[in-house]
């Protein structure tokens, strides 16, 4: 990271929110020479107004001053310099036609002079958006990939009598919870334990039949080797990860699935899918396995998960090797130092150095 000159002015980056854990971690640890401050925008959610355009458009009120705004998925309406961090599609008006005047307005804002940079959280997100943004007149020099940072923890020490597998994510069915349940039941190993942190909700993307939902809930409730926490503070999730043996989430739809990265931060081998940014996060065969899920049946995915779990259970040396591989993978892409060095360049360019 470039050094700041003595006596240089601290510059304020106004952020829209830091509700997710990774945002709290990253925005609580700004690059040198900058500070993050929460800006006030119109709180549509408090008024229970759930309009896609309003939810993903930011108009900051003049209660606090910032040198630059940094939003997460939100197009800024203010006549003020801003950068936007993008995890999936942009503009984030999923149900809106590209011919809609509001959609066209958002593209003009992204191409306009006030938008200084589009920061994609993965190459996958950049690839998804690049062509239509270029067609809208967005300067390709504005676009870059800056990965999230993850906090790292030492393992707490595993339970020698059990092999603990963790799943975390409220969108249980979308994130591959059913396939993990099937795999766990096939495992048939008395030392295996499954810890699920989830509200078991059906959120978006995957809509299982009622009998599948009923089977999952019944299986979880009746198996004494499965523990369910519907709500758990994040620090407790991390505590459980640090004492576990494996994290599994073969999600079907996700732009990033940050819990995989958080599991890696605790030194866990991971079994995940090849969806979204995950092939950029995990390394197949190095710190776990990245499984294809498209055009495969639930049974086929479950069968492969079972095989990989058995492989790790029967090979302690491989388990240790895969867990230890996380440190270098994170060091290459997902540290605060890497993120903040890249953000410093973006912020400096946006503010004229």
Label the model's feature ranges:
Residues 295-320:
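C-terminal "capping" alpha-helix adjacent to the active site of nucleotide-linked donor transferases
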Residues 252:
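Aromatic "clamp/platform" in nucleotide-sugar-dependent glycosyltransferases that forms part
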Residues 269-272, 279-282:
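Short hydrophobic beta-strand element within catalytic cores of glycosyltransferases
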Residues 231, 239-244:
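Short alpha-helical donor nucleotide-sugar binding micro-motif in glycosyltransferases
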Residues 112-142:
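A short, active-site helix/loop in glycosyltransferases that binds the activated sugar's phosphate group
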């Amino acid at each position: 990271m470039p050094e700041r000159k003595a006596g240089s002015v601290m510059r304020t980056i106004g952020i829209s929110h830091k509700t997710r854990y990774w945002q709290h971690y990253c925005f609580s640890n700004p690059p040198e020479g900058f500070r993050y401050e929460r800006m006030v925008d119109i709180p549509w959610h408090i008024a229970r107004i759930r309009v896609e355009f309003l939810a993903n458009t930011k108009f900051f009120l003049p209660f606090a001053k910032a040198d630059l705004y940094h939003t997460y998925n939100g197009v800024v309406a203010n006549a003020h310099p801003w950068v936007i961090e993008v995890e999936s599609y942009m503009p984030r008006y999923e149900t809106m036609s590209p011919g809609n005047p509001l959609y066209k307005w958002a593209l003009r804002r992204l191409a306009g002079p006030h938008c200084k940079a589009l920061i994609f959280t993965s190459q996958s997100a950049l690839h998804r958006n690049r062509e239509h943004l270029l067609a809208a007149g967005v300067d390709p020099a504005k676009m870059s990939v800056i990965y999230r940072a993850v906090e790292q923890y030492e393992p707490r020490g595993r339970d020698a009598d059990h092999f603990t597998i963790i799943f975390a994510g409220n969108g249980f069915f979308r994130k591959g919870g059913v396939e993990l349940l099937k795999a766990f039941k096939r495992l048939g190993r008395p030392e295996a334990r499954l810890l699920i942190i989830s509200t078991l909700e059906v959120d978006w993307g995957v809509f299982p039949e009622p009998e599948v939902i009923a089977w999952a809930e019944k299986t979880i409730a009746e198996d004494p080797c499965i523990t369910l926490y519907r709500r758990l503070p994040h620090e407790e999730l991390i505590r459980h990860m640090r004492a576990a043996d494996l994290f599994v989430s073969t999600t079907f739809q996700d732009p990033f699935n940050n819990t995989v990265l958080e599991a890696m931060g605790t030194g866990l081998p991971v079994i995940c899918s090849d969806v979204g940014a995950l092939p950029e996060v995990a390394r197949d065969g190095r710190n776990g396995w990245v499984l294809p899920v498209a055009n495969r049946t639930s049974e086929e995915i479950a069968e492969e998960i079972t095989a990989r779990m058995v492989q790790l259970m029967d090979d302690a040396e491989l388990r240790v090797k895969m867990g230890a591989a996380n440190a270098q993978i994170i060091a290459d892409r997902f540290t605060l130092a890497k993120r903040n060095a890249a953000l410093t360049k973006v912020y400096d360019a946006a503010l004229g150095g």
